[in-house]
């Protein structure tokens, strides 16, 4: 009888990626198969997120439900990972002593050993260390699940924004070696992946060591990934404006595989609030980067993150944010009411904006962005869009579903043989959360770009020219 594993995941795409790696790791090492039913599981893992308010209490409520399962199944192993685990550590077991394993985002690769120790009666295991890149060296080979895949290229953040827990829960910035990233993506391409989404808490801060001892910048990595046969689309998230340098903008001029969509969080349109947030950029600098990006890629759409009701945010500060939203014409946003995160500098500031004021501001902000998103969608009406076909539509399984370059979901009628490839579709209807279209042609009628060899891309780098952060590049001869 096979052993069963249930993983419940909260939070960002990095957590989703980590959970998929946990499943692959425990399958490869111990033969665990995933189940959607916690009652069937031999191991229950909760991968947590600490971004939202009352994250800790949410964890203990979930653990309380699992406690009942363990009462009926004493051999059940319960583990808690993710950012709340990093923050709370032993405190989790103090409040929930039936938890067997507490592990951080950087120690998930040690799960097989920790589970074995628990099952052998060696007691509970707590490991929330930051062993840098060791995690990636211990994971099994990637397995594709469709035409798109996430690939983590770096971990952590060294910016220490006053509201953010990431540096404390995932550590400072650590980049994976360039060769490791390219090898993983090449493996995925061999399995039919056509689109990769490069992940990192501050992904454009990537500075990966190379085989020759030099440093690969994020801009160089984008070109190298684009050169891998079979990879026709590249997305990445999440970016920081201060690291969105000119060499990255240049990539948008000559690398069509990088999609015409960018998520670049600004958080606020007020320089005063940005300073209090310890964001090392101004509104003018942000707008300047977007202006240069649109000169390089005129059809690009932009999304962002916004925090409303940050301590001491005045009506004038909020109006500055609304002005920025209209000037940039954001396509979408992840917008949140500010709530203090324990252990961050902002948690020591008075949370002095009334909750009703916060709610009104958030509703107004989201209303404007939703209207802008609809206008951008309507501008696509009648156009031909290239869709990466992901599978049957959730609205109608007799139809297909895919995404445009600018991340719009499109539903259309077509043969299921199109799944996993590209299709050109004429947009016939615009809805609030999706588009409808008419199939025009399949991939066999397209002239897709032929990839070049990675070494040719490397040879394009100028000798010993520092990039925007002063890191010199090495050109092999």
UniProtKB/Swiss-Prot annotation:
- Localization per record: Cytoplasm
Q: Where does [4Fe-4S] cluster 2 bind?
A: 157, 161, 164
Query: In what residue span(s) does the TRAM domain sit?
Result: 378-441
Q: Could you tell me the keywords of this UniProt record?
A: 4Fe-4S, Cytoplasm, Iron, Iron-sulfur, Metal-binding, S-adenosyl-L-methionine, Transferase, tRNA processing
Annotated residues that bind [4Fe-4S] cluster 1 are located at 12, 49, 83
Entries under InterPro entries matching the protein:
Elp3/MiaA/NifB-like_rSAM, Methylthiotransferase, Methylthiotransferase_CS, Methylthiotransferase_N, Methylthiotransferase_N_sf, MiaB_methiolase, rSAM, rSAM_horseshoe
Q: Where is the MTTase N-terminal domain?
A: 3-120
Q: Which residues form the Radical SAM core domain?
A: 143-375
Q: Single GO cellular component annotation?
A: cytosol
Q: How is the cofactor bound?
A: Binds 2 [4Fe-4S] clusters. One cluster is coordinated with 3 cysteines and an exchangeable S-adenosyl-L-methionine.
- Top EC group: transferase
Q: Which family does it belong to?
A: Belongs to the methylthiotransferase family. MiaB subfamily.
Query: What does the function comment of this entry state?
Result: Catalyzes the methylthiolation of N6-(dimethylallyl)adenosine (i(6)A), leading to the formation of 2-methylthio-N6-(dimethylallyl)adenosine (ms(2)i(6)A) at position 37 in tRNAs that read codons beginning with uridine.
| Subunit | Monomer.
Can you name this protein?
tRNA-2-methylthio-N(6)-dimethylallyladenosine synthase
Q: What is the lineage of its organism?
A: Bacteria, Pseudomonadati, Pseudomonadota, Gammaproteobacteria, Aeromonadales
């Amino acid at each position: 009888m096979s052993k069963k594993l249930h993983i419940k995941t909260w939070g960002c795409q990095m957590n989703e990626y980590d959970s998929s790696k946990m499943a692959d790791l425990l399958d490869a090492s111990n033969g665990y198969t995933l189940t959607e039913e916690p009652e069937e599981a031999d191991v229950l893992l909760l991968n947590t997120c600490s971004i939202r308010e009352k994250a800790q209490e949410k964890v203990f409520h979930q653990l309380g439900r699992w406690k009942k399962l363990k009462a009926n199944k004493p051999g059940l192993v319960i583990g808690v990972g993710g950012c709340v685990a990093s923050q709370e550590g032993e405190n989790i077991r103090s409040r929930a002593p039936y938890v067997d394993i507490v592990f951080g985002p950087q120690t998930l690769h040690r799960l097989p050993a920790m589970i074995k120790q628990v099952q052998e009666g060696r007691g509970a295991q707590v490991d929330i260390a930051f062993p840098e890149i060791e995690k990636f060296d211990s994971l099994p080979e990637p397995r594709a699940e469709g035409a798109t895949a996430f690939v983590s290229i770096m971990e952590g953040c060294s910016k220490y924004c006053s509201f953010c827990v990431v540096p404390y829960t995932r550590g400072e910035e650590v980049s994976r070696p360039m060769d490791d990233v390219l090898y993983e993506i090449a493996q995925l391409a061999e399995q039919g992946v056509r689109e990769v989404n490069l992940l990192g808490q501050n992904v454009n801060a990537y500075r990966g060591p190379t085989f020759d001892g030099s440093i690969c910048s994020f801009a160089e990595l984008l070109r190298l990934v684009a050169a891998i046969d079979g990879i026709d689309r590249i997305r990445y998230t999440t970016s920081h404006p201060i690291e969105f340098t000119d060499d990255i903008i240049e990539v948008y001029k000559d690398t069509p595989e990088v999609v015409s969509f960018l998520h670049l969080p600004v958080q606020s349109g007020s320089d005063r609030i940005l300073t209090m947030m310890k964001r090392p950029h101004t509104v003018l600098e942000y707008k300047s980067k977007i202006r240069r990006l649109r000169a390089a890629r005129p059809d690009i759409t932009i999304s962002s993150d916004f925090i409303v009701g940050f301590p001491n945010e005045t009506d004038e500060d909020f109006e500055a944010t609304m002005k920025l939203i209209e000037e940039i014409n954001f396509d979408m946003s992840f917008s949140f009411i500010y709530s203090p995160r324990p252990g961050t500098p902002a948690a020591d500031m008075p949370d002095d904006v009334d909750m009703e004021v916060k709610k009104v501001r958030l509703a107004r902000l989201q209303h404007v962005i939703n209207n802008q998103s609809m206008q951008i969608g309507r501008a696509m009406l009648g156009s031909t869009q290239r869709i990466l076909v992901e599978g049957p539509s959730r609205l109608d399984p007799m139809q297909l579903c895919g995404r445009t370059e600018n991340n719009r979901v499109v539903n259309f009628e077509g043969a299921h043989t199109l799944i996993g490839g590209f299709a050109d579709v004429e947009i016939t209807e615009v809805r609030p959360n999706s588009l409808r279209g008419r199939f025009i042609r399949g991939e066999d009628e397209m002239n897709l770009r032929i990839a070049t060899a990675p070494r040719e891309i490397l040879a394009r780098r100028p000798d010993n020219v520092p990039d925007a952060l002063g890191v010199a590049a090495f050109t092999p001869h």
